[in-house]
């Protein structure tokens, strides 16, 4: 019988997940289908119960349900619980189990472009919202020891740091201070929506004095190169946009559902083509 997978969210028509996962199923000769389900906030509980009754094998969760979904699951992975959000659900032995592959997917994507272990790096995170939280906790879980957080509201950065139970040396900074100290970091990660289409001329941090070999990663992928990435490239930095995070988090979910490892480069090239790259 064909295995059913999917993604729930609102809106959902723009999602590239069905294209990416269905191509992977076809490539691996798997009898499975991935479908996008439009689910409004007021019917989330009913939708989850319906998917469980249908025997769905697993599904992704996107905006605006990543936090609310946690009330309707049988179990939640400890890291996802710490992050406070779920983006992947596995249906196993009659139970819906929630995970967060956003942060771990990002860590894997970042490691793929770093020639050295991330654990040895000094990292600066820009932003203290949901995406930053997932990345911060996942980097800490992976053993990274130095992660500073810069945010427009410094208190929010302090709250994020205080919420993490792992042993990490972290300082909360203003964006102004981070701009002055950017040369002290090996990796800078941009997690806000600043610079996203259509406000492409905006940047949270003016790149001006990076040290040699710095990696600058932006979780935005529209445009492919945000202002911060363009400035970093001019400084000779290694740059990475949000496509890698999207692909790696999807590949990790695929692996958790099926036990099979998809072809990540194939997934990435497909997503780039679909985005017009």
UniProtKB/Swiss-Prot annotation:
GO cellular component, one term: cytosol
Enzyme's top EC category: oxidoreductase
Family in the record: Belongs to the shikimate dehydrogenase family.
Role summary: Involved in the biosynthesis of the chorismate, which leads to the biosynthesis of aromatic amino acids. Catalyzes the reversible NADPH linked reduction of 3-dehydroshikimate (DHSA) to yield shikimate (SA).
NCBIfam families: aroE (TIGR00507), PRK00258.3-3 (NF001319)
Subunit field text: Homodimer.
Name this polypeptide is given: Shikimate dehydrogenase (NADP(+))
Organism: Bacillus cereus (strain AH820)
Organism ancestry: Bacteria, Bacillati, Bacillota, Bacilli, Bacillales
């Amino acid at each position: 019988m064909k295995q059913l997978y999917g993604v729930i969210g609102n809106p959902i028509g723009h999602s590239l997940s069905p294209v990416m996962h269905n191509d992977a199923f076809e490539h691996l000769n798997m009898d499975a289908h991935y479908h996008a389900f439009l689910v409004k906030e007021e019917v989330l509980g009913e939708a989850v119960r319906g998917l469980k009754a249908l025997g769905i094998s697993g599904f992704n969760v996107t905006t605006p349900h990543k936090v609310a979904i946690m009330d309707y699951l049988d179990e939640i992975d400890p890291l996802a619980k710490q992050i406070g959000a779920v983006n992947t659900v596995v249906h196993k032995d009659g139970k819906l189990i929630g995970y967060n592959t956003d942060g771990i997917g990002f860590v894997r994507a970042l490691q793929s472009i770093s020639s050295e272990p991330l654990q040895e790096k000094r990292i600066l995170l820009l932003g203290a919202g949901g995406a930053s939280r997932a990345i911060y906790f996942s980097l800490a879980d992976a053993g990274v020891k130095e992660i500073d957080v810069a945010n427009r509201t410094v208190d929010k950065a302090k709250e994020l740091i205080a919420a993490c139970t792992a042993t990490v040396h972290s300082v909360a900074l203003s964006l102004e201070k981070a701009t002055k100290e950017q040369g002290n970091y090996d990796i800078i990660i941009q997690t806000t929506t600043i610079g996203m289409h259509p406000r492409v001329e905006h940047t949270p941090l003016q790149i001006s004095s990076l040290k040699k070999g710095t990696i600058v990663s932006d979780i935005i992928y529209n445009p492919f190169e945000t202002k911060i990435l363009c400035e970093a490239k001019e400084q000779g930095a290694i740059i990475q946009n949000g496509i890698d995070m999207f692909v790696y988090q999807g590949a990790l979910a695929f692996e958790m559902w099926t036990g099979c490892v998809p072809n990540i480069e194939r997934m990435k090239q497909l997503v780039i083509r679909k985005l017009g790259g």
